[in-house]
Each structure stands twice: as C-alpha cells, then as structure tokens.
C-alpha cells in the first residue's frame, strides 16, 4: 500500500494519498504494526477489522466503511495485477454509505453567532471559525474545501463563480453585503494571496525543503485549517450553548432548514426533499433560474 501511496503522490493526487495514508495507519494500529500477506486477507480478517473500528477505535459506520472501501480498492488492484487470488474478503463487511441524520441549528443561533465578536471573549481562532461557519451559511452551505479554495478571480461583477469539488457542478452566487463585510475583514491577511480567505495562507510551519511541491504544501495547509476550524467550532458551540456538535456541515443544513422555514420552494433548495442522489438534486437546480436562487438566498440572509 505504501507503493500505491507513493504513486498517488507522484501523480499529484495528494488528497487521495492522505486518505490512503489514514487508512493504512488505521489498519496498522489494528494489526499492532504486524505485516500481513495479501493471501491472508480474508473475510474473517476484515470482519475482525470492522469490529475493531466500531468497538476499539469507536468510529462511526461511515468512517469504517470509508476505510474498508479504500482497502478493498487496494486489494482489487493487487488482484488485477495477479499478486493474489480473489477471495472476496469484503463481502461480509459494510462498505456502503449510511444516510446520516441532517443536523441544523435554529436561525436564532445563526443570528447569535453573527452578533458575537471579540468583546464576547472569543479568541482569534474561535472568531475565524465563527466567520467560516457564517460564510458557509451565506454561500448556501458551501463546503469547507470549496470555501478555502475560493480565489479572488472567482469573484467578478458582483457574482461568485466556482465549481463544487464534490460534483464538479458550476455554481454562481450573487455577492451580498454580508459576504463582502466578511471578506474585507481578512483582506490584510490575503493581500499577497490569490485566495479570498486566509485558510491557505502560510502558517509558519512550511518545510525547510525548498523543493517541496507547491500543491502538496497547499494540501497540508488545507488539512491543518480544516482541523483547526473544526476544533474551534466545537469549542465555540459549547461556549454559547448550542446543543449538539457544531460543524461546518451544520451550516449547510441550517441554510436549507431556514429556507424551508421561510416558505422557499423545495426545488430551490439543494437539499431537495431527501433525494438520494446528487443527480436528482442537479436536475432540480438546473431547471431553476439563477436569479430565483439568488433572491432566495438574499431572503434568508435578511432574517438574520
């Protein structure tokens, strides 16, 4: 698996390589760093690993499924290369994606977060986490990976244009006053950066190796920022008394819930009545005039 990770890095697939590395590290912890031959990977071994993930590592079913899918992909590559016979070791473990309960907070909580400032004993890192949450909400539930990688060139003539990394769908969002105010707040930090927000600005921990790949460094900065934002959002949620775990994903569902509560048409919302596929959602979104979606977003921001 180390060879596969090295190949992914060589091909510039840094994010994917990190997923494979995380899976390998998890499997090594399960094995106490003991090697295992490909021919020894069978259904019993995978059932045992799945049990370890649930009961010892205490990860959720989607996380265990994520690790098992990566192991399965690695195993199938080895089978395709004739390195081991196919024994179907993953036939008895869960490798699907469980539908998770949609998490949202009331509009009052979003308004409460908007009114918070450093006077309310927010640390600078908590304030940035709060701002990331608000910007995700303002931008119709944009994911952190897309938010962090927004470039100044994505903003043109009063509209933000970007491609959603998960689906490759092209989105256009009218730039509202709330968005502009948050962006201007960080302009000093992004003055020499191509990005709108400072999540990928050098954190001072850059490797001394001058030959390090720029894309690899960007991936490192992104994952550090993601972990930092997640940690301080949880702290912020506890500090202001928000029930449940506060994450950026909550911002996405809170936007949809607020939209539904303001009688905005279901077809306008990306959540789209619990559809099971992105394809169905895209069909709905593609049939709507972008101005209708922009008006809906402006209506939502006005209630804060």
Region annotations inferred by a language model:
Residues 104, 164-168, 273-298:
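Catalytic-site neighborhood detector that most strongly recognizes the C-terminal catalytic loop/helix
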Residues 3-15, 24-101, 116-120:
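N-terminal core-binding DNA-recognition domain of tyrosine recombinases/integrases
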Residues 110, 176-243:
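Active-site/catalytic core of tyrosine-dependent DNA strand-transfer enzymes
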Residues 121-124, 221-222, 230-271:
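Short, basic (Lys/Arg/His-rich) helix/loop patches that form interaction surfaces
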Residues 76-83, 136-157:
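Short, charged phosphate-coordinating catalytic segments
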Residues 153-159, 243-244, 264-283:
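Short, polar N-cap/turn motifs at the start of nucleic acid-interacting alpha helices
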Residues 149-185, 201-202:
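Conserved tyrosine-mediated DNA breakage-rejoining catalytic core shared by Y-recombinases
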Residues 92-144:
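Basic, Lys/Arg- and aromatic-enriched nucleic-acid-binding interface segment
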């Amino acid at each position: 698996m180390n060879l596969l990770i090295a190949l992914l890095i060589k091909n510039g697939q840094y994010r994917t390589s990190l997923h494979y590395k995380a899976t390998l590290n998890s499997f090594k912890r399960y094995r106490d760093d003991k090697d295992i031959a490909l021919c020894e990977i069978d259904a019993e071994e995978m059932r045992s690993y799945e049990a370890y993930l649930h009961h010892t590592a205490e990860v959720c079913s989607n996380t265990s499924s994520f690790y098992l899918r990566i192991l399965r992909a690695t195993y199938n590559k080895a089978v395709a290369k004739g390195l081991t016979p196919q024994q179907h070791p993953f036939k008895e473990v869960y490798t699907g994606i469980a539908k998770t309960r949609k998490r949202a907070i009331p509009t009052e909580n979003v308004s409460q977060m908007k009114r918070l400032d450093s006077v309310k004993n927010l640390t600078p890192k908590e304030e940035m986490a709060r701002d990331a949450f608000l910007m995700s909400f303002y931008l119709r539930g944009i994911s952190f990976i897309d938010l962090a990688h927004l470039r100044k060139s994505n903003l043109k003539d009063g509209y933000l244009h970007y491609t959603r990394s998960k689906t490759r769908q092209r989105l256009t969002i009218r730039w509202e006053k709330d968005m502009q105010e948050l962006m201007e707040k960080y302009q000093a930090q992004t003055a020499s950066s191509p990005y709108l927000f400072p999540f990928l600005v050098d954190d001072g921990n850059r490797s001394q190796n001058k030959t390090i790949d720029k894309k690899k460094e960007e991936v490192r900065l992104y994952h550090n920022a993601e972990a930092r934002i997640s940690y301080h959002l949880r702290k912020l949620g506890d500090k202001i008394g928000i029930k449940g775990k506060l994450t950026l994903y909550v911002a996405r569902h809170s936007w949809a819930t607020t939209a539904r509560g303001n009688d905005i048409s279901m077809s306008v919302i990306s959540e789209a009545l619990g559809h099971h596929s992105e394809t169905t959602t895209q069909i709905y979104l593609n049939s709507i005039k972008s101005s209708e979606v922009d008006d809906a977003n402006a209506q939502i921001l006005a209630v804060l």
